[in-house]
Structures are given as structure tokens and as C-alpha cells.
């Protein structure tokens, strides 16, 4: 019995190691498949934004730009991962909830846009693609965006939503750069 129990333990251990190696391979495969879905996800974001774009751009009467070149530079730098994460969080938690309340006709469209952004965020987190989100530092450019947004008060929502297409372009730039690494 002692020998068969030892053999059984060894088989269980080997099965566990094999399963964990298979799981690791699946996670790595999922990671490598993420970039293939990027164009589709960006198209969905752009289509969802297209449903509210005119509304917010018509209401945005300000000449200044909220999403500046310094934010794009952070997206291109080693802080790109954090800048992307912080900007997604900013739009989901600060901008979109306020934008939904501006007109009942656009509420569902803004909500749909938010769901698409959440899907992107979930894909980044659940896949644990460290190649795409490898760092933990804070982005100064994102802090500047948030500060400018706050100073604009009610007009900040129009400004941030009217520039959402710029944000999508920055996401695309960041992800395209990361795929090449």
C-alpha cells in the first residue's frame, strides 16, 4: 500500500504541474491574442462615440484642449501603462457618470460607450498582459487633465466627452507601440 500511495501522490503532483503549465500557456496565448482583437475593440469604441460626438462637440464652446500632447507623451513613455489605466478610470468614474445626466436622449449611448471602455479595461486586467500594463507609477499628465477638468466645472464634461476621439487615438497609439515590443 505504501508504494501505491507514493505512486498515487507522484501522479497527482505531476498532473498538477501539467495543469498549471497548460494554464500558464493558455494565459500566455490569451495575452498574444489580445492585440488581434484591438482593431475590433477600437472600432466599437469609435462607433459608440460616434453616437454622442456631435452632441458633446456642439456643446463644447471652449478653445482649449484638455487631452494635450503631454498626455500622448506619457502614453508613449514608460508611464503609458499607468496613464492608460488612469485615463480609463477617469472617464468611467468622473466624466461619463456626469455626461449621462446631460440629456436623456444620449444617456443610453454614453452608457454604451462606458461599457465598451469597461470591456477594454477588463481585457487588460483579466488577461494580465504585463507586456501591455507593466508599471505602477502615476502620470503627471493625467493629473493635469483631471485638474483642468475640475477647473472647467460643468463645461469640463463637454470638453472631456468632445475629445473622447483623441483619447481613443491615444489608446491606439499606446497599444500599437506595445505590440511592437
Swiss-Prot record:
Residues 1-19 form the signal peptide. Disulfide bonds join 31-129, 81-135. Belongs to the IL-10 family. This is Interleukin-10. Keywords: Cytokine, Disulfide bond, Glycoprotein, Secreted, Signal. It holds the Pfam family IL10. GO terms for molecular function: cytokine activity; interleukin-10 receptor binding. It is found in: Secreted. It comes from the Eukaryota. Homodimer. Interacts with IL10RA and IL10RB. It comes from Canis lupus familiaris (Dog). One of its GO terms (biological process) is negative regulation of membrane protein ectodomain proteolysis. Glycans are attached at residue 137. PANTHER family: INTERLEUKIN-10 (PTHR48482:SF5), INTERLEUKIN-19-RELATED (PTHR48482). GO terms for cellular component: extracellular region; extracellular space. Its main location: secreted. Major immune regulatory cytokine that acts on many cells of the immune system where it has profound anti-inflammatory functions, limiting excessive tissue disruption caused by inflammation. Mechanistically, IL10 binds to its heterotetrameric receptor comprising IL10RA and IL10RB leading to JAK1 and STAT2-mediated phosphorylation of STAT3. In turn, STAT3 translocates to the nucleus where it drives expression of anti-inflammatory mediators. InterPro entries: 4_helix_cytokine-like_core (IPR009079), IL-10 (IPR000098), IL-10/19/20/24/26 (IPR020443), IL-10_CS (IPR020423).
Amino acid at each position: 500500500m505504501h508504494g501505491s500511495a507514493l505512486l498515487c501522490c507522484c501522479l497527482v503532483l505531476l498532473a498538477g504541474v501539467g495543469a498549471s503549465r497548460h494554464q500558464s500557456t493558455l494565459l500566455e496565448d490569451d495575452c498574444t491574442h489580445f492585440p488581434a482583437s484591438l482593431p475590433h475593440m477600437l472600432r466599437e469604441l469609435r462607433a459608440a462615440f460616434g453616437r454622442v460626438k456631435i452632441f458633446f462637440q456642439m456643446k463644447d464652446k471652449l478653445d482649449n484642449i484638455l487631452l494635450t500632447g503631454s498626455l500622448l507623451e506619457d502614453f508613449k513613455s514608460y508611464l503609458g501603462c499607468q496613464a492608460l489605466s488612469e485615463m480609463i478610470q477617469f472617464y468611467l468614474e468622473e466624466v461619463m457618470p456626469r455626461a449621462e445626466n446631460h440629456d436623456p436622449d444620449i444617456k443610453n449611448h454614453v452608457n454604451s460607450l462606458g461599457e465598451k471602455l469597461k470591456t477594454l479595461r477588463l481585457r487588460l486586467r483579466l488577461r494580465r498582459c504585463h507586456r501591455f500594463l507593466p508599471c505602477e507609477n502615476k502620470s503627471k499628465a493625467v493629473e493635469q487633465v483631471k485638474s483642468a477638468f475640475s477647473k472647467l466645472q460643468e463645461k469640463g464634461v463637454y470638453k472631456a466627452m468632445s475629445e473622447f476621439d483623441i483619447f481613443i487615438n491615444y489608446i491606439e497609439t499606446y497599444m500599437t507601440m506595445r505590440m511592437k515590443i
